[in-house]
Amino acid sequence: MNLHEYQAKQLFARYGLPAPTGYACTTPREAEEAASKIGSGPWVVKCQVHAGGRGKAGGVKVVSNKEDIRAFAENWLGKKLVTYQTDAQGQPVHQILVEAATDIDKELYLGAVVDRGTRRVVFMASTEGGVEIEKVAEETPELIHKAAIDPLVGPQPYQGRELAFKLGLSGKQVAQFTKIFMGLATLFLERDLALVEINPLVITKQGDLICLDGKLGADGNALFRQPELREMRDPSQEDSREAHAAQWELNYVALDGNIGCMVNGAGLAMGTMDIVKLHGGSPANFLDVGGGATKERVTEAFKIILSDDKVKAVFVNIFGGIVRCDLIADGIIGAVAEVGVSVPVVVRLEGNNAELGAKKLADSGLNIIAATSLTGAAQQVVAAAGDK
């Protein structure tokens, strides 16, 4: 789960990380009032969306008078910002962050992720701030310096100092960087984060370090113990179908194809998508109904899949282990009857009560194509979608 920049900076403040004075505003009037609270200009106004590339898309602007702040807010609030990280529709802008402008001398990068290879939180720092760290890693990997956090002892100040020296910092900047490093590491661990980025971490003309931007990603599996982060969730920044799926504990990811997929188990779901592609089709989604599938959840899964206008056929692939195939069949029959499915539905059932499930589908009188093998099912659904 991603957080907005203004939310990240609110958390930064609690952990002692320096950031420009700023206010998140939902109306043009609030934006003007925020500028008055901050003091004399210039100011920076930023659209708050869960996407990078805002500056190039016109979503970040330096302004010198309050009239320009109002104009910026009026132009963007309620609109959608399209960047290279969004889809063609863009992300809705509901808040504008108004901040004091910062005199920048140099831009750095500081971030952290969970490294599955080392099974540790790994911090990354670079002198190449203000640009995509992925690009730096690809073109000049030697400019990225790392520090792995030992889970037994936690972050250590010496690690921050080592990174500071590698970045060419000296004097008070080393102490400032070490404080930022320790605060950020504590924030990462205490809040169960999966990603944190300060890009850029700037050195001002006065020689001080400031967190000019902030990006936080929370581990969705740990949100049950992070109630404050759960409250920060902004569903408007998420795909509406994915948000709906989450309410029913369905794992759904929208894709660009035309064959809807409903599968139980993440591994089987990925394998199903692979075999659809292998036979010339294009999956419209990843959808895992999980091991505790019920008739109601299957019905909702159908509704979510069919809410995508691109879907020309639906492939239901169920291996009955924990979940019984006859219950899935009941859900499919109920969903097809309730939703009024007008596209072909190919169903492959294997495992627990598969024969009973297949009989229920056959006796339903509905236009459901039964498949006995995975390969055959893939070929049938691709043909039904008109891809071959």
UniProtKB/Swiss-Prot annotation:
GO terms for biological process: succinyl-CoA metabolic process; tricarboxylic acid cycle. GO terms for cellular component: cytosol; succinate-CoA ligase complex. Its EC number is 6.2.1.5. Mg(2+) binds at residues 199, 213. ATP binds at residues 46, 53-55, 99, 102, 107. Pathway: Carbohydrate metabolism; tricarboxylic acid cycle; succinate from succinyl-CoA (ligase route): step 1/1. Belongs to the succinate/malate CoA ligase beta subunit family. Substrate binds at residues 264, 321-323. Gene3D superfamilies: ATP-grasp fold, A domain (3.30.1490.20), ATP-grasp fold, B domain (3.30.470.20), Succinyl-CoA synthetase domains (3.40.50.261). Heterotetramer of two alpha and two beta subunits. Pfam families: ATP-grasp_2, Ligase_CoA. It is an enzyme of class 6 (ligase). Succinyl-CoA synthetase functions in the citric acid cycle (TCA), coupling the hydrolysis of succinyl-CoA to the synthesis of either ATP or GTP and thus represents the only step of substrate-level phosphorylation in the TCA. The beta subunit provides nucleotide specificity of the enzyme and binds the substrate succinate, while the binding sites for coenzyme A and phosphate are found in the alpha subunit. Keywords: ATP-binding, Ligase, Magnesium, Metal-binding, Nucleotide-binding, Tricarboxylic acid cycle. Coiled coil: none annotated. Binds 1 Mg(2+) ion per subunit. Its cofactor is Mg(2+). This is Succinate--CoA ligase [ADP-forming] subunit beta. InterPro entries: ATP-grasp, ATP-grasp_succ-CoA_synth-type, ATP_grasp_subdomain_1, Succ-CoA_synthase_bsu_CS, SUCC_ACL_C, Succ_CoA_ligase-like_bsu, Succinyl-CoA_synth-like. Residues 9-244 form the ATP-grasp domain. GO terms for molecular function: ATP binding; magnesium ion binding; succinate-CoA ligase (ADP-forming) activity; succinate-CoA ligase (GDP-forming) activity.
